[in-house]
Amino acid sequence: MPSKNLQQAVLTNEFTTNFITTCKDWLDVNGLAKGNLEKKRDDNEEEERLKTESKLPGHDIHGFDNEIKSLQHFLLDQKVRREFKSLVIVGEYGVGKTALCQKIFNDEAVKSVYAPRVWVSMENKESKEGLDGKICVLKKILKGLGVEELILETISTDAKQEFKDNEEVASNQEAGEIDRETEKEKELSALLYALHLNLRWKKYLIVFDDVRENDNWDEKLDAKLKEDEKWGKYLSDGFPKGSGGRVIYTTRDENLAKNLVAQKHEIHRLWPLSDHQSVWKIYDAVVKDKQKESPRNDKKCIDELMNKSRGLPLAARLLAERDPVFVDDEVGPVGSTHGQTDSSNRQPANQASS
């Protein structure tokens, strides 16, 4: 008859094997496996984007203490309190960019210093061709500042009318005097002017979450107007300088990040978590929140969770959505299958882009 130690070793091995299989299945289902993420980057495929909000994520954030302190310093540094500053947070899907920004956006010290604060989810189902993308984002900011839809419609109508009037009188003007601005350019200029007025003399904080190349939001906001250029042509015209305004972007695109800021130190790269315990805490918190019993947290399981999630907080949370895997000598929740997980119960989790 096998010894008790041998039986326990066999059970532990079965548990670890089941845990590994569970992890792999969930990563494949939710597109978080390393190969799937690399394919997304290679194919540049545009999966459906979800709208994000400024409210706290609803769960504790583990492993980002240094990143939180860095963002607090960026926003609360008194030495540059009147300068306009921008920062880009770059990282892969599921690494926690959105959750990190939600955390700092709702920080009490930040809230006491910045007003207004505007959260802009770059998710948008409208046209983004030409200037449409920029116009759509500007309207989102203005709505976040309390500007009514009627005023935005009036701006659009006035721009169309001005363009039409210019076309009618163009034939009576000399070539050098013709206003060659398009209808969209006039609307963009008017929206930038409205934004400038709403932000002037204010210490504002604006977060642009999940910026992508096809959004056409790809200009440096700290650029200064040149003497020979007309005001209202560039996005930077809408963001007043000298009152301590701050802008934070999140993106997965390293090349786009370089177009959004002037200096390399203004790009903050967010890497997957390297702390095994932080990843386990994320996983365990979801399991407990679902009122399930946590699987054993021995070193093998923690290491396997780290290996399969690759340190991505979203992957750890998704893995926890499954029924925990139990070995025969552990007591699982009522209705659970000891030592295995029924694949027929697999339910996709609600994912929040980050």
Swiss-Prot record:
Biased amino acid composition, Polar residues: 337-354
Highest taxon of source: Eukaryota
UniProt-listed GO biological process terms: defense response
Residues binding ATP: G91, E92, Y93, G94, V95, G96, K97, T98
Chain segments annotated as coiled-coil in the UniProt record: 33-53
Keyword Zinc in annotation: no
Keywords: ATP-binding, Coiled coil, Nucleotide-binding, Plant defense
InterPro entries: NB-ARC, P-loop_NTPase
Residue span of region Disordered: 328-354
SUPFAM superfamilies tied to this protein: P-loop containing nucleoside triphosphate hydrolases (SSF52540)
Molecular-function annotations in GO: ADP binding; ATP binding
The UniProt record lists the keyword Coiled coil: yes
Entries under Pfam families matching the protein: NB-ARC
Domain NB-ARC: 45-122
Functional note: Possible disease resistance protein.
Protein name, per record: Probable disease resistance protein At5g45490
Source organism phylogeny: Eukaryota, Viridiplantae, Streptophyta, Embryophyta, Tracheophyta
